[in-house]
Amino acid sequence: MPTNVTPDYKRAEEAFRAAKTTDEKIARLEDMITLLPKHKGTDHLFADLKRRLAKLKEEAEAGAGRHGGHAGPEIGREGAAQVVLVGATGAGKSSILQRLTHAQPEIGDWPFVTRILQPGMAHYEDAPIQLVDSPAIAPGTMPVHLLGVVRGSDGVLLVEDLSRDTLLDDFETAMALFAERHVRLVRERAEPHDRDAVRCLVVANKTDAPGAADRLTLLRELVADRLETVPCSCAPDAGERRPLNGSVADLPGVLFRWLRIVRVYTRTPGQHFERTKPFTVFEGGTVGDVCALVHKDFAERLRFARLWRGPAAAALLAPHGGGGEPLTVSRAEPVHDGDVLELHL
C-alpha cells in the first residue's frame, strides 16, 4: 500500500478489514475509493479496489436474488438532489412517487408490491429533485442494494403510515434495521464525509385516514428529539379539506428547503439576459462551484464574476427586467438562491 494515503483512508481500510457482512464491506470499500488520493502511485490500488467492489456487488446481487428481490437498473443521479423513499410495505412510497413525478410504479393492495428501485423527477418551481422509490423494508427483507443508494443519496424520506396502529413500532423497526447495517438516519450530518450518517425526514403519510391526527401527535412525540416530521396525504383534495395536514403537492417545496438547494442563473457577458434552467448547488456553495458546473475549466480560468442579488436579481429575472447594479466578486463568494452570475475569464 502506498505510504502517502490520508488518515481517513487508513481508518476506512481498518473498518473494511473489520467488516463482517457483504453490506459493510461494500460500504467500507466505497469509502476507501472516495478517500484514496488520485495520482500515478495509486492507479493500481484504485483499479484493485474497483475490482473488489464489483465482485462484492455481484455477491450481494446474487444474495438478493435468492431472497426474491433484485436491484433493477442502476440509478444514476439526476437533478438538484437525490432523495430515497424508504419504509414499510403499504406505507405509500409508490403513491408519493406517482403523484409527484411522471413515473408509473406498480401500486396494489398486497404487500411488497415494489420489487426494484424506481426513479422519478419531482419539481419545485424550476428545481428538479430526483425521488427514488424502493422495495419495502422489514425484518429479514432489507434489500442489499438499497443501502448503497441510501448512503450515496442527499437524503432519505422515511414514509410512515398514519392509518396503522403499529405506526410507532414501524418507525423503530426501520431505524433499527438501518442501524444494524451501519446506516444512521439523522436530522443533520455532523461530518460531510461520514457515509454512515444520512439525513432523514419522516413523512407521516395518509393524514386523511381515520384516527390519523392522534397517531400523528404520538409519532411527533416519539421522534421529536431525533428527526423532523412532515404530514402528507396523497388524496387528491387533501390539501383543500385539511390544509393543516398537508398535501403531497407541498412536498417538493418542503424538500427544496430541507435540502437547502440554491439556484443560480447565468448571464452571457455583453448579451441580453434570458432566463434559462438554473445551475444548482447546496447552501454554502460558491461562485467557483457554479463555474465548475458550467464548464470544467471555468473554475480555474475565472478572473472575476458580476453578481446580481436580491432586488437587483429579481428585477433582472422579471419579464423585460433590466436589473440593478451588479457586484464584482471572486470565485470564493458564497451564492444565494436566485443569484444571477456573469462569468468573466
What does each of the following model-derived ranges do?
Residues 13, 17-86, 91, 183-345:
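C-terminal-of-GTPase-core extension/linker across diverse P-loop GTPases
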Residues 48, 99, 152, 170-177, ...:
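Alpha-helical scaffold elements adjacent to nucleotide-binding pockets in ATP/GTP-utilizing enzyme cores
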Residues 148, 169, 286:
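Short, well-structured alpha-helical interface segments that form or flank functional binding sites
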